[in-house]
Amino acid sequence: MKFGTFSLPRQIPTCKGGRFTRVLQSIGSVIREFSASANALQDCWKNGNESKEIDDVHTLFRYCTNLQSAKCLHARLVVSKQIQNVCISAKLVNLYCYLGNVALARHTFDHIQNRDVYAWNLMISGYGRAGNSSEVIRCFSLFMLSSGLTPDYRTFPSVLKACRTVIDGNKIHCLALKFGFMWDVYVAASLIHLYSRYKAVGNARILFDEMPVRDMGSWNAMISGYCQSGNAKEALTLSNGLRAMDSVTVVSLLSACTEAGDFNRGVTIHSYSIKHGLESELFVSNKLIDLYAEFGRLRDCQKVFDRMYVRDLISWNSIIKAYELNEQPLRAISLFQEMRLSRIQPDCLTLISLASILSQLGDIRACRSVQGFTLRKGWFLEDITIGNAVVVMYAKLGLVDSARAVFNWLPNTDVISWNTIISGYAQNGFASEAIEMYNIMEEEGEIAANQGTWVSVLPACSQAGALRQGMKLHGRLLKNGLYLDVFVVTSLADMYGKCGRLEDALSLFYQIPRVNSVPWNTLIACHGFHGHGEKAVMLFKEMLDEGVKPDHITFVTLLSACSHSGLVDEGQWCFEMMQTDYGITPSLKHYGCMVDMYGRAGQLETALKFIKSMSLQPDASIWGALLSACRVHGNVDLGKIASEHLFEVEPEHVGYHVLLSNMYASAGKWEGVDEIRSIAHGKGLRKTPGWSSMEVDNKVEVFYTGNQTHPMYEEMYRELTALQAKLKMIGYVPDHRFVLQDVEDDEKEHILMSHSERLAIAFALIATPAKTTIRIFKNLRVCGDCHSVTKFISKITEREIIVRDSNRFHHFKNGVCSCGDYW
């Protein structure tokens, strides 16, 4: 009896009742309908074709595209005894590995008699394809110890790829040298990949330079090695020696251009890919989208995407991410919908982009739907990155409690998870909680902090004024060898600068490479924050002298520094230079700094004219800057005009209602105060409470305006009362204009005395040694009366008092403030 692809009557026992015949008939119907491969096998093994030569058997391997047909072929080879041929058995091993069943491959391999090096190579590479590095090494060791064979050039690439340490790689390197395969292009390229993977790119380059012959694979290995190790500029320099490129080279170099910020070189490579027909290759087009997205060239991204004949999931993810990165969420959502209509199913990367897009839109309900979708898919358990993305999503929405809940729910956490929750707290103003999360991470000791951790927690120290905590982190950085990392040290310098230690910030600045604008921007901003506008301008000129190109952030920090120091002429010079010399189009932040600068200088009409001449539609920050200036300078009429425009674009912002109310209060227009407060109350808006904080004995103490719940409140109040009497004796007169309530003078004086910074000063005078520096951090602008009082206190107590408010630093010493009463 014959059936389908098998001839098995002598090998299968007969079943009673013909049941086995019916089983065979059922199996036959399945095989006949299973696939083209099964039909091909049937055609080759019909009656009269059983004596085909081995060459015909080799052709059958091409038809085996699934495990079932491979097993059919295996059975036939066993029956025909062709399995005894080493070459055929080895091909069967390779087939099983290709189809993903390494266990069957190993079973077949173990039954091969007189295995040759070809069979060993296929088994070793099969383990490598399956990602089983330990079995690759074990199989190679067995080959070297028991086979009595000599490895060839095909043996080493898979083994080198499986090496888990550079020491293991060195051992295999020695073996390749011993057996004479050192300069085989495949082996050499694998060695370059190995050394690059373990950050020994110098060894890789030596090997590359010594190669007598280099093929395209060798060049690609070295270029990608530089990219993997973060040496993008070296990769681009090396590519200058290339006469031709293939698609792999193009993809590596496009990544290098993105990392190095070399847009022009990326365009040149794109032109090459078009000329040589490489742009049409799927992964080249995908990488081009990534390149243009990084530089904000969304039109070019769209052009590349539109020209693609075939688009895969990566293509859609790339174009969606491009619009997400450049904060165009509506277009990104539209593309996501197009992707679904194209029957492309989203993956984790799609959902990560979607989470960011929806957080940009502020759509809380849709964001929760994303979380629900990932839960149903089980991706929280499979991929930690999706959980991290959901934490980021809630943090961007300001829902830090939801972010913390998701973080606590994650089945596993990595360093990125911790960095995400720390930065989420810090970015939403919860500096103490961010520092606490970092301390918890350190106490658990399961996950080591990395660059991202320091860059997340140091801004929290800056925000809270936690200088001692920041100094502890500085010590950790020294211990962990991250002291010379540019981004970490820049964050550290920013921390010192914003905690009032400008000299330490400057010292760190001159210890790191200053080849890009990031460290320069930080130091310029710190000097501006301290009111040292002239020094900020000098730093900017020094930056230009060192050949560093300023970016849009540089000019924001510089204009802000000019604003806080009253340098109107210098600010105008910078604003014009930004456009004429560097081709930077002013953003709303640049315009806002200019309006603020004119307003602080009292040039209110000039500020209004400047707003009317803007090429962009003024937003709330522009009109808010003008309203703030009108409040300081008492121009109620212009303030009303500014507020009308302001509430058109931002009607629900409580801070602007408070600002307008304060302007009316300062002018004694209590009817206007009542009206604005009534409007704010009707909208359900609540005023942000004023608070001040200071660090004492490694603990951050927080004081709220008018709050009487502090354990030492009575002692602090007695200290303030005694101070008040001394201050009046040397000329202090309370300025009731800064009391924003229509009450009696005695009550006004009490309200002024309960401002948060005064409570903090009283606490510091009680809790810290005499004549030591007091550092206070305030979330709102210092009022004029508190500014005067602090000057007097610094004189009679012989203390230096450093106050950082929402705008800048004030250094009070011997009755004088560093701001020169200009803030």
UniProtKB/Swiss-Prot annotation:
Highest taxon in the source lineage: Eukaryota
Protein family (similarity comment): Belongs to the PPR family. PCMP-H subfamily.
PROSITE patterns: PPR
Phylogenetic classification of the source organism: Eukaryota, Viridiplantae, Streptophyta, Embryophyta, Tracheophyta
InterPro entries: DYW_dom (IPR032867), E_motif (IPR046848), Pentatricopeptide_rpt (IPR002885), PPR_At4g14850-like_plant (IPR046960), TPR-like_helical_dom_sf (IPR011990)
GO biological process: RNA modification
Name of the protein in its database record: Pentatricopeptide repeat-containing protein At4g33990
Annotated GO MF terms: RNA binding; zinc ion binding
Ranges where the record places region Type DYW motif: 729-823
Stretch list, region Type E motif: 622-697
Extent of the PPR repeats: 85-115, 116-151, 152-183, 184-214, 215-249, 252-280, 281-311, 312-346, 347-381, 383-413, 414-448, 450-484, 485-515, 516-550, 551-581, 587-617
Pfam families linked: DYW_deaminase, E_motif, PPR, PPR_2
Keywords: Repeat
NCBIfam families reported for this sequence: PPR (TIGR00756)
Type E(+) motif as annotated region, ranges: 698-728
